[in-house]
Amino acid sequence: MTMKKKILSTAVLAAMGIGSAHAVYQSPDGLGEVLLVPYYTVQDGNETIFAIVNTTDYPQAVTVRFRQAYTSRQVLDFNLYLSPHDVWTAKVQDDGNGGAEVVTGDKSCTAPAITTAIPFRNFEFTGSKVDNGPTDQSRVREGYIEILDMATGPFQDDSNPPAVWDANDDG
């Protein structure tokens, strides 16, 4: 019995002596490659308004991914292309059919294109992917948003062609 206590005590002390694991690294300038918006909701008449800002002097491409709160399954994703210092704004609102949708009047380029609104989808939790949760659109009414940096300029030749990246430029 004494031997077991010594081994357990040694194991606990060894575990305490190990430094903490650093799974997340924050750069000194506070900028990163992943942004998590911890909660969106359209429950009880609420809307969630958010903005994505390119703070750099270069064009930037990001993936925007919406996940429902029940099991974190994806309900919508798209790519967003921002010109230097561009701001993209949108909101998540009730879609009038028991679900939710993203609405924007912003002219920044998205793929697929979002001209005004795009509804959240239930393909990740219906059909062959059904789980123990609800399968109707009520499930997409709250969740969280992942914003992932795919690429930031400059181009290899250090150019910045606005015709490719600046959807807000009328010229």
Label the predicted regions.
Residues 4-6, 12-13, 19-171:
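Gly/Pro-rich, tryptophan- and cysteine-flecked surface segments typical
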